[in-house]
Amino acid sequence: MALDRRGFLKFIGGATAGILATPVVWKGLDDVSIWSQNWSWIPRNIKGANSYVPTVSKLCPTGIGVRVRLVDGRPVRVIGNPEHPLSKGGVSSIAAAEVQMLYSPARMKRPLKRSPDGAYVMISWEEAEAMLLDGLKAAKGGDALACISGDDNGTINELLSAFVQQSGSKSFFLMPGEAQPAAKAWDLMGGEGQIGYDIEKSDFVLAIGANVLEAWGTAIRNRHAFGASHPHGAEPTAQFVYAGPVLNNTATGADDWLPIRPGTESAFALGLAHLLIKAGASSSAPDFDAFRSLAASFSPEKVAAQTGVDAKALTALAQALAKAKHPLVIVGSEFSQGAGAAPVMAGIALNMLLGSVNRDGGLRALPVARKVVPAGMDRKAMLQQDLTLWASAIASGKAKAPKAMLVYEANPVYALPQGSAFKDTLAKVPFKVAFTSFLDETAMQCDLVIPVSMGLERLDDVCTPYGCGEVVYSLATPVTAPLFDTKPAGDALIALGGKLGLDLGVASFEDMLKAKAAAHGADFDKLAEGTAFTSRATVGANLSFRPDVLSKALDVKAPALPLALAPVMKLNMGTSKTAIPPFNTKTIRRWEVQGKEGYVMLNGATARKLGLAQHDRVVLSNPTGKVTVRVNIFEGVMNDTVAMPLGFGHTAFDEFSKGKGENVMHLLAPSTEPVTGLAVWTGAGVNIAKA
């Protein structure tokens, strides 16, 4: 059934509302001072002049602009930048903690190498660079060198990919996210450039799966758009509807929440397409008739059976979409990764039927600036690479392992589905190097660890994060000199490339960013002053529905297990490359983790059916793995579904993350989406039993 905000609050009552609103710190720690947030390494009582420096957060995946408060030249606080288009004065919980993380004792302070006994020892930069040079000399030709980047949208990816390609390899990969399946869907349907979602100008936003107000795309900008359309004491100027398995932050904020089973986003979207076409929606696309035939098989009754949505609610939603002047449909993963191209294709098809392509308030085709590193990959080529399938092939022996691997600000051992299996991949690589600011799970498996200056200590950039409704290019400028013996990776790699005889085509990292600014038509000096470049330009969008691809890509079989698994991502709990910032421990809710034990969420009906009660210790298991957790009864979860938060279960990093809860990625295994060949892992199921 559909559940609006007022109805839900009446249903759950004040007690549950209090739980949702009250953050409680973890219990059971031996040293209570750890949780006081009065740590000795945090700057305080600094006397001196105040100043505010604009820059961009490289830690937060939303690409927001921030202002850093300095006292006597020392960074002490991050606040939102009201002048930045992706911030509008807002700031994410992870960006807000970025200054604190500068001073963390867990930061990498010197290069490390693994000794013969497996322990790490500190070495000089000279020794580290010599070791790196020797290791990479042996990795030339074929696919002998691989690189994984955790930077979603920086120009450094062109440099890293150039480094790989000049060595004779094609094995450059980005960490999985929403952009890769969207790029595949967009390409299959004939799109040019990058998909953009013009949320600010829409009067009806339907998010299917995509957690747009918390962890999907440009979440802080999305929140501002939502707030602007819902002024206090006045009628909303836009309606937000969320369809997904969990009452997450997007569902809580939205005007309506329609619970649907995990992994059924495509069927839900095609059910809406069927109703829109039945009501008269059409398209000039050459394959519209074939798409109409495909959509006709998704009647409200069939979609209700597949997704769990109420058929009448689906019909009412289709009618509301059709009446809107500027409707927008966004389809994505509930936890910002693991979805295939099929759900995105179904979402694009809905926007086509609604006449919302390349118009204000709709789906927009954004131009992508040309690459500026001649030997590097362009953005489209990067997004075609599938890290998960590549790593699985090596781990299983179906593909040859590279001789050397560079991992840049990424943590695949922790963050990939069945990520612990990535250890098997790394074990087959003779020489492994991590460029990182923290000793995370992946760095712990590497032979050499290079300490990278954090985003507030270096020059960097952000190119139109996925989800933007317009082109946005921003420059991250250093607000302080490196606090420890660290270096930005860009110039170090350029110098290393010269010693290896690689023709990277760039003289310095700053010159590379100046070229990227010029490629956007932006003024570098204004960017350096903190002014983001924006453009409302679009490129052509001569789209087709591609029902031939979509019909086959839908054929992903969910495992026949009692419960569907719904991972939940929240930025306060970190990202795929960052663990829980110490400041954010106070935002962890009581029944998300207690001491070292994590919690999962079931609704009351599902718990009663399984004979479970609040706080019961249970084992979730499937052929991929198993975890031991406790039960939290929460009515904001779909029937026969168990919701589990991301961000817990670290085995490395620092005392604030290590050993807290379980890693949901242990329960997720990739399968292959038919036709597209993409790795997908949004349709997992689990068994549940009392521990």
Swiss-Prot record:
List the InterPro entries. Answer: Asp_de-COase-like_dom_sf, Molybdopterin-Qrc_component, MoPterin_dinucl-bd_dom, Mopterin_OxRdtase, Mopterin_OxRdtase_4Fe-4S_dom, Prok_Mopterin_Oxidored, TAT_signal
Q: What's an example Gene Ontology biological process for this entry?
A: anaerobic respiration
Task: Spell out the subunit comment.
Answer: The Qrc complex is composed of four subunits: QrcA, QrcB, QrcC and QrcD. Can form a supercomplex with the [NiFe] hydrogenase HynA1 and the tetraheme Type I cytochrome c3 TpIc(3), its physiological electron donors.
Q: Where in the cell is it found?
A: Periplasm
The record lists the organism as Nitratidesulfovibrio vulgaris (strain ATCC 29579 / DSM 644 / CCUG 34227 / NCIMB 8303 / VKM B-1760 / Hildenborough)
**Name the UniProt record assigns to this protein:** Menaquinone reductase, molybdopterin-binding-like subunit
Give the matching Pfam families: Molybdopterin, Molydop_binding
Could you tell me the keywords of this UniProt record?
A: 4Fe-4S, Electron transport, Iron, Iron-sulfur, Metal-binding, Molybdenum, Oxidoreductase, Periplasm, Signal, Sulfate respiration, Transport
